[in-house]
Swiss-Prot record:
Disulfide bonds: none annotated. It holds the Pfam family zf-C2H2. It comes from Homo sapiens. The keyword Cytoplasm does not apply. This is Zinc finger protein 695. A zinc finger (C2H2-type) spans 156-178, 184-206, 212-234, 240-262, 268-290, 296-318, 324-346, 352-374, 380-402, 408-430, 436-458, 464-486, 492-514. GO terms for molecular function: DNA-binding transcription factor activity, RNA polymerase II-specific; RNA polymerase II cis-regulatory region sequence-specific DNA binding; zinc ion binding. InterPro entries: KRAB, KRAB_dom_sf, Znf_C2H2-type, Znf_C2H2_sf, Znf_C2H2_type. Residues 4-87 form the KRAB domain. GO terms for biological process: regulation of DNA-templated transcription. The keyword Nucleotide-binding does not apply. The lineage of its organism: Eukaryota, Metazoa, Chordata, Craniata, Vertebrata. May be involved in transcriptional regulation.
């Protein structure tokens, strides 16, 4: 075999592609390049064609090595000359399909080249395993998307709505949404969208195409995001867990064998749906789903449940017991699932993304609620006044206006509230605590939602628009009040004289006339 060229073991990036890498990825690149260089030198291969890389970078060999060892940015040196030379030359296109681009990890490219060179004596780093471990530790890293931002910085700002984005692609999506244009139309169902990606995904649903297949479990998906979520399940701590015996397996194939053994032992089958169980007691519990039977009743409020664990969880509402504590901030929860969701606040993980606007959430329920903003769906309707809500909890809270129920009482002044969060907010009046501060003007607030509303004064954002007259508002409550002008609704009634008002503030002023 001829002299080994540095290009055979090097992965090069253009200035534009270098900008897409985050600090951790750049650090990995430097470590690999320097170690491979030292390994080649130690084997006496210092006569290989190093001039390829160094000439492309328009600098001498010592300068580049010093630059990398000093952990400086290689593309900051001699920018004018390097701008004329794209180091990512045809050598990469020999190994990578054009449509893959940067979506090929460091490891895959390097392993291909090492195998091609047959370097049995050369001990090069096995970065496939290294990054596999790194990926498990760094949840935000995605080995198949080097351009994804792994930090929480938002360097791209929309000049229309002043929103910040960590990805340039998301900024482009935001700009298109402001124009109101939806040039992409699905030929099958006629749906329109402002993004071609959504239309591509839509068409895949119609034709049944699932191009993203998981090598671990064999599942196929029509969206890359769903494929990514599947991979996260496999690399997680409990990626292949058997629901029957709670054992965890390294591979899904091992899990499949165990699950098959469980299935063969299941002799108790439900006549209603065909599901099988290995214990008669489990089948009995399952049948309650079909019959609607709820034998476990709460002695406090009379609410019934079909399973005893559900009753146990419910009782914590009355006892205020919260056994699950966050190690990060000390906050406690009554359910383990609530703690799991809360932990994502600290990790910054937002795995649930809206296909319409690109906004991400740390809970699937929040995404479901958010989608109703785009669809305008309000499935929860008040039987008293007909008002509809996007979330069931909002309806429950609203009903207390009609019933007058205020179960949460302040121990300081005796004032009662319809919701526990209102009591928490009220308590800050006594303590004087205002933890939420505006970065623009320094004004502080005792509730985060007040800060969010206040920020719109600086940005000029008015996201809540009246469908009747087109008037826009910075707060949803202002829109709700405004709508009563069109509907002539007066839900706030004086108990003394029966006079009705469309705003609670007006009722409060009126009530003072009686006192």
């Amino acid at each position: 075999m001829g002299l080994l060229a540095f290009r055979d073991v090097a992965l090069e990036f253009s200035p534009e592609e270098w900008e897409c890498l985050d600090p951790a990825q750049r650090s990995l690149y430097r470590d690999v390049m320097l170690e491979n260089y030292r390994n080649l030198i130690s084997l006496g291969e210092d006569s290989f064609n190093m001039q390829f890389l160094f000439h492309s970078l328009a600098m001498s060999k010592p300068e580049l090595i010093i630059c990398l060892e000093a952990r400086k940015e290689p593309w900051n040196v001699n920018t004018e000359k390097t701008a004329r030379h794209s180091v990512l030359s045809s050598y990469l296109t020999e190994d990578i399909l054009p449509e893959q681009g940067l979506q090929v990890s460091f490891q895959k490219v390097m392993l291909r080249r090492y195998e091609r060179c047959c370097l049995e004596k050369l001990r090069l780093r096995n970065d496939w395993e290294i990054v596999g471990e790194w990926k498990g530790q760094k949840a935000s890293y995605n080995g198949l998307d080097l351009c994804s931002a792994t930090t929480h910085s938002k360097n791209f700002q929309c000049n229309k709505c002043v929103k910040g984005f960590s990805k340039f692609a998301n900024l482009n999506k935001c700009k298109i949404s402001h124009t109101g244009e939806k040039p992409f139309k699905c030929k099958e169902c006629g749906n329109v969208s402002c993004m071609s990606l959504i239309m591509t995904q839509q068409q895949r649903i119609h034709i049944g195409e699932n191009p993203y297949q998981c090598k671990k479990c064999g599942k196929a998906f029509n969206e890359c995001s769903c494929f990514t979520d599947c991979k996260r399940i496999h690399v997680g701590e409990k990626h292949c867990k058997c629901e029957e015996c709670n054992n965890i397996f390294k591979s899904c194939s091992s899990l499949a064998v165990v699950e098959k053994n469980h299935t063969e032992k299941k002799t108790y089958r439900c006549e209603e749906c065909g599901k099988a169980f290995n214990l008669c007691s489990v089948l009995t519990k399952h049948k309650k789903i079909h019959t609607g039977e709820k034998p476990y009743k709460c002695e406090e409020c009379g609410k019934s449940f079909k399973l005893f664990p559900y009753l146990t969880q419910h009782k914590r509402i009355h006892s205020r017991e919260k056994p699950y504590k966050c190690e990060e901030c000390g906050k406690v929860f009554k359910l383990l699932s609530y703690l799991t969701q809360h932990r994502r606040i600290h990790t910054g993980e937002k795995t649930f993304r809206c296909e319409e606007c690109g906004k991400a959430f740390n809970q699937s329920s929040h995404l479901t609620e958010h989608r109703r903003i785009h669809t305008g769906e309000k499935p929860y309707k008040c039987e008293e006044c007909g008002k509809a809500f996007t979330w069931f909890s909002y309806l429950i809270q609203h009903k207390r206006i009609h019933t007058g129920q205020k179960p949460y009482k302040c121990e300081e002044c005796g004032k009662a509230f319809t919701w526990f969060s209102y009591l928490t907010q009220h308590k800050r009046i006594h303590t004087g605590e205002k933890p939420y501060k505006c970065d623009e003007c320094g004004k502080a607030f005792n509730w985060f939602s007040y800060l969010t509303n206040h920020k719109r004064i600086h940005t000029g954002e008015k996201p809540y628009k009246c469908e009747e007259c087109g008037k826009a508002f910075g707060q949803s409550s202002h829109l709700s009040k405004h709508k009563t002008i069109h509907t002539r609704e007066k839900p706030y009634k004086c108990e003394e004289c029966g006079k009705a008002f469309n705003h609670s503030a007006q009722l409060a002023v009126h009530e003072k006339t009686h006192t």
